[in-house]
Regions:
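Redox- and metal-dependent alpha/beta enzyme cores, enriched for Fe-S-associated oxidoreductases
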Residues: 83-160, 167-173
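Short, charged N-terminal beta->alpha structural module
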Residues: 26-51, 135-162
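Short, hydrophobic beta-strand segments that form beta-sheet elements in well-ordered domains
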Residues: 30-31, 74-77, 161-165, 181-184
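Glycine-rich, anion-gripping cofactor-binding loops and their flanking helix/strand elements
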Residues: 54-70, 107-113, 145, 154, ...
Length: 184
């Protein structure tokens, strides 16, 4: 079956939400998702001291890394916490603007510390697992079988299986009882 991916953008006037943005740092890297990427130029032209970062995809923060030396903080524009957590590993303050809910906040040091502890726990689970499942998405810009195969080669002393799928949910993963840790 052929799958057609059609980019979809949020139809939302983002300018009223930008009025909520209060950032003390002077140079702010603006990062967003595919749903808001068409408004990135508008956002940056209306935010003093902003540096256009681009799109974040999953936990891939390459667009953020490219502007790291030019900024003092990040402003993530989008929904949810998945993408902002990925930005926290770059050791700059991370602010979040959810234009849909018209909410603005900074991720606190306490929240970051809690996230890092959870992350360490996941790394420990990986270290102790005998069997690892590597998840590869078939979605455009996410499919990277070459990286998965390289990862499998580099993981020593463990059985490594590669799982390829379009959509993944925890319920599906529970069907594979022998996997001690999942890597995405």
């Amino acid at each position: 079956m052929k799958i057609l991916f059609i980019p979809t953008y949020v139809k939302l006037d983002i300018l009223p939400s930008l009025k909520k943005v209060k950032i003390k740092e002077e140079r702010v890297g603006v990062i967003t998702t595919a749903q808001f990427i068409d408004q990135l130029d508008l956002i940056c032209s209306n935010l003093k001291g902003s540096v256009k970062g681009g799109q974040i995809l999953g936990c891939n923060v390459e667009s953020a890394k490219k502007i790291l030396s030019k900024i003092d903080a990040f402003l993530y524009i989008g929904l949810g916490m998945f993408h902002p957590w990925a930005l926290t590993v770059l050791n700059k303050p991370v602010y979040i603007l959810n234009p849909e809910a018209k909410e603005f906040k900074k991720i606190s040091e306490k929240e970051i510390e809690k996230y890092r502890k959870e992350r360490k726990g996941k790394i420990l689970r990986f270290m102790h697992a005998e069997t690892v499942g590597v998840i590869v998405s078939t979605k455009p810009l996410q499919y990277n079988m070459e990286k998965a195969l390289e990862l499998r080669e580099n993981i020593k002393g463990k059985k490594v299986y590669i799982f390829v799928s379009d959509n993944i949910n925890e319920g599906q993963l529970e069907n594979f009882k022998g996997i001690g840790c999942w890597v995405n």
